[in-house]
Amino acid sequence: MRTCATASRDATEPVAGTSATARTWLLVEQTGPWGTEALTESHLDPRVGRALEAAADGTGVRVALVRRPGRHADCHRSAARRVFLAHTAPSRPWIRTAAVTGPEALLDLDFARLGAGEHDGVWDPYDGEPLVFVCTNGKRDRCCAVLGRPLAAELAVSGAEAWEVTHIGGHRFSPTLFVLPYGYAYGRASAPLVKDAVASAREGRILLDHCRGRSAWERPAQAADLAVRELIREERADAIDIVHSEAVPPPHDGAEHAGEKTGNPSRAGKDAKDSPREGEGTQDPRRTGTASTTGLLDAPAPTWAVTVAHRDGRSWRVTVEQRADGTPTPVSCGSPLGRPARMAVLSVLPLG
């Protein structure tokens, strides 16, 4: 069977701007098997998993399970598990860590404060090597296991601080992963590329190759960030920030296609509700034939204006449009063919 990752690669689908969105990550060690919905389908008490999901909802915190690479026998004994909190916004990224014996204690965290970037001194600061989290949950998509688990194992053998993670979206970009402290995700990754990404993160930099975007931002903003970085060849992780993002009327016909830059995909903070979710391949009904009326097929494409600032004082207005005009591909293994939504960068204009 042709996999979703193979189909996406063959279609040269852009990976930029498809990262999972999370201003703050809560990563909870859980050995043993993971189900499709890992927080409630693993050896974690499902009542705790559901409560964590509810506590994080709408706060900017994303909860995921992690485990060390390798075989995952789980004898169900009550043992201390490693937990991480990581805030990925460029103003002041941080990682906190602890070992907890009862995961229900995590429900005492102030999720709203954590999502806003305030850890209030909880747990201990993490000051070790950059952390790599590789998506490996084969119950969600076989590509994550077939491609992700060997990569995670190879990274662990090489000495990287590698973990497996339940779900970060974008199965068809497997092997896919993100690196902390900066929260940039990568797709179609190889071991040499990840090792370079870790070395770059150690120096406060990112890689532009195979980069899906920074999880702190929604998809239009991810696209805008990467477009500016490509334009000025900026790799310092915290040199770029997103100042503002808003939905705007689409450009006039003709201008939109003439102005497309790199095809970087993304979406931005305040307009998250209007943007496709984190590389899951939300399909645009205007172009997939799923529209219920002819009028919808002619609906204007969602468009955003994103203001991007450099710490040296420069800034740009980046116009980003949602499109679904690529080669039909499955968004995950076994799903029907469709045209996954992408973010097209139409223009990058300097301000001031």
Language model features with spans:
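Histidine/cysteine-enriched polar flanking segments
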Residues: 1-152, 157-260, 267-352
